[in-house]
Amino acid sequence: SRNPAKLLPGAYDPCLEGGASRTLRFSVSATPFSDANALSRPESFGFILTNPEGIYSYNKKMILRGNEYIAEDGETMLWDGKGTTVTVTAYAPYADVVDGSVAVSCPSNQATASELSAADFVLWKGSVNPSTDLSDGKIQLRLGHLNTRLIVKLTLDGAPVVTSKVASLSVGGLKAEGKCDLSADSPVVV
């Protein structure tokens, strides 16, 4: 990646010319699994920007400082001056990416709203053209869930059980960890 703050005095970088050569700014929201009608702002998230030209590509942990997201390492990230369409992947909670994949896990007990929100894994992946796709100069990231649905049909002696009569249910033997291949066109957790 390139950073104008790291250029030597008098140095010239032709990729820093043009209207698109400006600092990346973010507007980020996520819908928590515990309340599909609410929006939240994660305290941190993983951000991967892949530029097909190889320059101005980033893989960062973003943290919320005040009302702005910044790279945890303090690097100023820029769009390239050409306005190149890039692939952006954003996910929360943050975890290190290993070989293009991120480990995902969920707590075994999700009985309360806080336990349920601890199970959140939200993701957004798509193409962004900095010349046309920014709103107020910011990249808009609306992180959504990779949903997993477990359907349990309860029977007692072969007859269906009315679920309103079930006060509590425990299911054992489920795998609570997986990996999400962020390099896939449509990432899924397996």
Task: Describe the predicted segments one by one.
Residues 1-190:
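Sec-type signal peptide cleavage vicinity
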